[in-house]
């Protein structure tokens, strides 16, 4: 096997597992430790990995998070499908918490249940639901994060502690063995309280979020009951969900049942 082929194989492994050891490279590619080290040096020179003691990890990519309005303009068909499937799980009479993510807002647009109570910290989502009959809306008051369009702070968290709901639907920026993560600590603290107040926690994430880790962890993986995504994850990620008792729903599989 040529070096270029080995480098591709190493990167493919890292994309699935986030970490690789020198011993794993030797076993996977049937090469010596010296060859494995040279391959890691080459990948490091290309800024493709970060070398660690005994192996390597993928570098963390710090991307600027788009403003809420910018993300709304680029809401993908994948997010719409996830939102539609999530909305089908909200039944007449349910009491639910909906967070301020664009994927959860897609759920709100498809919500057809009646006699529902919705609690949210998103002014945009509350506006979407205000056009729907049969839904009672509680907008949590707090400090407005202008760019990302959510309310946060101690008053939001204190008010949330008074509510006990059937379901909480939470948009996810990162979900991995490191738990559920997000870019903004203020938003994460509110999401953490939302999770604590719900009988069932439903996470919504398109496939690009699976296996990734963002800045602030607000929940352990085993605090999530159900994950809705748009593509079937790799086996390693499915095993991770199984170990943590997380049920998986995939929109493309759901469509196949029609």
From Swiss-Prot:
DNA-binding segment(s): 20-39
Gene3D superfamilies registered for this protein in UniProt: 3.40.50.1360, Winged helix-like DNA-binding domain superfamily/Winged helix DNA-binding domain
Pfam families: DeoRC, HTH_DeoR
Cited SMART domains: DeoRC, HTH_DEOR
SUPFAM superfamilies (alphabetical): NagB/RpiA/CoA transferase-like (SSF100950), Winged helix' DNA-binding domain (SSF46785)
Consequence when changing residue 55 to V: In grl-15; loss of glucose repression, deficiency in glucose transport and absence of ptsG expression
Keyword Isomerase recorded: no
GO BP annotations listed: regulation of DNA-templated transcription
Domain of life: Bacteria
Impact reported for residue 35 to I: In grl-30; loss of glucose repression, deficiency in glucose transport and absence of ptsG expression
Keywords carried by this UniProt record: DNA-binding, Repressor, Transcription, Transcription regulation
Entry-linked InterPro entries: Carb_Metab_HTH_regulators, DeoR-like_C, DeoR_HTH, NagB/RpiA_transferase-like, Tscrpt_reg_HTH_DeoR_CS, WH-like_DNA-bd_sf, WH_DNA-bd_sf
HTH deoR-type domain: residues covered: 3-58
MF-aspect GO terms: cis-regulatory region sequence-specific DNA binding; ligand-modulated transcription factor activity
Function: Plays a role in carbon catabolite repression (CCR). Specifically required for transcriptional repression of the levanase operon by glucose but not by other sugars.
Protein's name according to its UniProt entry: HTH-type transcriptional repressor GlcR
Organism: Bacillus subtilis (strain 168)
Lineage: Bacteria, Bacillati, Bacillota, Bacilli, Bacillales
Gene (UniProt): glcR
């Amino acid at each position: 096997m040529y070096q270029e082929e080995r480098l591709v194989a190493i990167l493919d492994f890292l994309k699935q597992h986030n970490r690789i050891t020198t011993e794993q490279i030797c076993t996977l590619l049937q090469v010596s430790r010296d060859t494995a080290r040279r391959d890691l040096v080459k990948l490091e020179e290309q800024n493709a990995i970060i070398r660690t003691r005994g192996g390597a990890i993928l570098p963390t990519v710090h991307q600027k998070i788009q403003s809420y309005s910018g993300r709304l303009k680029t809401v993908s068909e994948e997010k719409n499908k996830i939102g539609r499937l999530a909305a089908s799980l909200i039944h007449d009479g349910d009491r639910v918490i909906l967070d301020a993510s664009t994927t959860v807002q897609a759920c709100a647009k498809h919500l057809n249940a009646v006699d529902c109570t919705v609690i949210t910290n998103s002014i945009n989502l509350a506006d979407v639901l205000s056009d729907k009959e049969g839904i009672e809306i509680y907008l949590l008051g707090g400090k407005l994060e202008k760019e990302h369009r959510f309310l946060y702070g101690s008053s939001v968290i204190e008010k949330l502690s008074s509510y006990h709901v059937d379901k909480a639907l939470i948009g996810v920026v990162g979900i991995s063995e490191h738990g559920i993560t997000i870019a903004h600590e203020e938003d994460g603290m509110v999401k953490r309280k939302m999770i604590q107040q719900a009988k069932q926690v439903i996470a919504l994430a398109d496939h690009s979020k699976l296996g990734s880790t963002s800045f602030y962890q607000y929940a352990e993986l085993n605090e999530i009951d159900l994950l809705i995504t748009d593509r079937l994850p790799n086996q390693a990620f499915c095993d991770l969900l199984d170990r943590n008792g997380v049920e998986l729903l995939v929109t493309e599989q759901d469509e196949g049942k029609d």
